Each structure stands twice: as C-alpha cells, then as structure tokens.
Amino acid sequence: MAGGLPHPVLLVDEAAKSVGLYKLNDVFHAQVIDSNVIYAWFAMVLLIILGTLATRKLAMVPSGLQNFFEVVVGGLESFVVENIGEKGRKVYPFLCALFLFIITGNLIGLVPGLDSPTNNVNTNAAMALTVFAYYNFWGIRMWGAGYIKHFMGPFWWLVPLMLPIEIISHLARPLSLTLRLFGNIRGEEIVLVLLFALAPVVGTFPMYFLFSLADCIQAFVFFMLAMIYLKGSLDHAH
C-alpha cells in the first residue's frame, strides 16, 4: 500500500520487514514503525549520501553533484536574503533543509517500488508544527514580550478585534501547510494509480514530467510560506 493506495512492491517496505521494523506490537497490534516514517528516514539517508558525495572532493571550479548542490543551495540562500535581509542567514539552514527534505520526499514517490513520505498527513503535520514552533521561537527570541505586538494591529483601539483574528490566523497556518502538501501529493498518487490501471507503463511516462514539476513547485511553496512566516516574526511590529 502506498499511503493507503494500491502500489507495486515497495522495496523499502520489504527491507524494513526483513529487519523486523514492521513487527506487530503485542499490545496495540500495530506496526512498531509506520511506513511513512521509514520513507522519511530513507529520504534523509539519500540526502546525506548525496551531500557526502557532493562534498567529498571539493573543487574551486565545481562540477557534477557539487555544482548542482551549489546552484540549489546558493540560489535558495540568495532568495532568502533578498526577501528577509541579512537576518535571513540565521534561519536559512532550517529553510534549506526543509526544502531539500520535502522535494526529495515528493520525488521518491515517483520511483517504482518507493513511496513518498509526504503523502501521509502525519509527516506533513509534523513539518508544519515545526515551522509554527520555529518562527514563533524566533519572534520571541528577537523581541521578547514585545512579540505580542505582532498580534495587536497598528492601533491600540483595534486590539479587541485584531488579537483574536491574528491568533486564529496563526493557528490556521500549520493546518494550511499540512493539508496543501498532503492534498497535492495524495492526489498525485491517486492519479498515478489510475493511470497504471488504465494505460501501459510506457503511457504514463509523459505524466512523470508533469508530476516532477508539481512536486518541485509544492516543495517551493512550503519553503516560501515558511520563509514568509519567519520574515513576519523577525520584522519589527508596527
């Protein structure tokens, strides 16, 4: 099953079963570790391997994987600094790691025999709650008790109206991040399953380009929204 959907043999699932990670818990009769966690770990290991290969022989004139990672990482850093300012360098490592994990998690779901950790609502909720905690942490760290001014509006007489609106708005952010990514990736899985059922494997190849593009866009949207939330917490409240 791929996120609850029929799927070809999942290679990482089979490997996990062989080492006992999918043994049933005697009390709750559930898997010791859920499959979406296994695939999240797989995405992390893949990124670590690629990062190690890219930095194993650093050169002044980059090529291959080093060149690819320098373009991606450097481009993301420039984007963050342009939008947040120099303060963005403090939060950039978090944003970059978030983007790389999401795009890797999205894309591995397109590989036959693998599944995407981001088509599970729990994975996305964990990332969304981490973003929520992280930008509020930076807001409190930067402004202390004055961070509450971000929720009060520009005039004191608007506080009774703005405070509840802002609180609801901020609480809705993790839900929005979770459902946006989950809905898009799960929808992609459903379409892939239907295409495999209705058309030969070769007939699905053109869709892979479209889905790859959509996966990259969804990763960037999540990254950009997290950056906007961080920018709001780092900027001075007016």
Swiss-Prot record:
Entries under InterPro entries matching the protein: ATP_syn_F0_a_bact/chloroplast, ATP_synth_F0_asu, ATP_synth_F0_asu_AS, F0_ATP_A_sf
Bilayer topology term: Multi-pass membrane protein
Main subcellular location of this protein, as a coarse class: membrane
Compartments where located: Cell inner membrane
Presence of the UniProt keyword Phosphoprotein in the record: no
GO BP terms: proton motive force-driven plasma membrane ATP synthesis
GO molecular function: proton-transporting ATP synthase activity, rotational mechanism
Keywords from the UniProt entry: ATP synthesis, Cell inner membrane, Cell membrane, CF(0), Hydrogen ion transport, Ion transport, Membrane, Transmembrane, Transmembrane helix, Transport
Ranges that cross the membrane: 35-55, 61-81, 94-114, 128-148, 151-171, 190-210, 211-231
UniProt key word Cell inner membrane: yes
GO cellular component, one term: plasma membrane
Role description: Key component of the proton channel; it plays a direct role in the translocation of protons across the membrane.
NCBIfam families: ATP_synt_6_or_A (TIGR01131)
Protein family per UniProt: Belongs to the ATPase A chain family.
Assembly and oligomerization: F-type ATPases have 2 components, CF(1) - the catalytic core - and CF(0) - the membrane proton channel. CF(1) has five subunits: alpha(3), beta(3), gamma(1), delta(1), epsilon(1). CF(0) has three main subunits: a(1), b(2) and c(9-12). The alpha and beta chains form an alternating ring which encloses part of the gamma chain. CF(1) is attached to CF(0) by a central stalk formed by the gamma and epsilon chains, while a peripheral stalk is formed by the delta and b chains.
Protein name: ATP synthase subunit a
Organism the protein comes from: Solidesulfovibrio magneticus (strain ATCC 700980 / DSM 13731 / RS-1)
